[in-house]
Amino acid sequence: MLDMTSICSAFRRPRILIIGCGDIGQRVVTQLLSGPNAHLGKTYAKPKIFALSSSPERFAELRQQGITPIGGDLDHPETLWRIARLASNVIHLAPPQNEGEHDLRTRNLIQILSQGAGSVRRFVYVSTTGVYGNRHGDYVDESSPPLATSQRAKRRMDAESVLRHWAIHQGVNLSILRVPGIYGPNRLPIE
């Protein structure tokens, strides 16, 4: 006999798409899969995690971590069709391309997600405190106006602006995290 409770809970299982599943993305996944699955008195199924990857050689590694790899490349929007309706929650950790003042990768991403007709409900974008520019030691907090001067920071500001506009028009709950320098194994700011 079918257990309808189990079947119904499988359909409520959160689906999370990670864009940029490198060091930080994998740490996020570890927390998502190992953390408590109860919140405010409700118990939830562990999330189903997908990761966009342009490197097929990483697929086996991602699968070992409990992640379902999805082939695609933010620089080639024609490869992104698989993610249009894939998940209701998106965590965007991928950096912008290396040149220009506009983040074409984020633009490509939201263009394809817009084809999902409202399937994305929550979107987290990891930006950088670099958007505040060099304040020469002055105090900076989230209410400080951005003063992006580098091309990279301008691309991040562009992504934030485009995402805000998209989120308002799509009814998406958007969170932008402006993270300072990220350090870890092989990520130290010394030569």
Task: Give the positions of each predicted feature.
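Glycine-rich Rossmann-fold phosphate-binding loop(s) that bind the pyrophosphate
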Residues: 21-22
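N-terminal Rossmann-fold NAD(P) dinucleotide-binding loop
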Residues: 25-26
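N-terminal Rossmann-fold cofactor-binding loop
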Residues: 50-57, 73-74
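Conserved Rossmann-fold cofactor-binding substructure of NAD(P)-dependent oxidoreductases
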Residues: 63-87
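NAD(P)-cofactor binding segment of oxidoreductase domains
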Residues: 83-125, 161
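Conserved Rossmann-fold NAD(P)-dependent oxidoreductase catalytic core, especially the SDR/UDP-sugar
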Residues: 110-151
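Conserved beta-loop-beta element that borders a ligand/cofactor-binding pocket
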Residues: 161-185
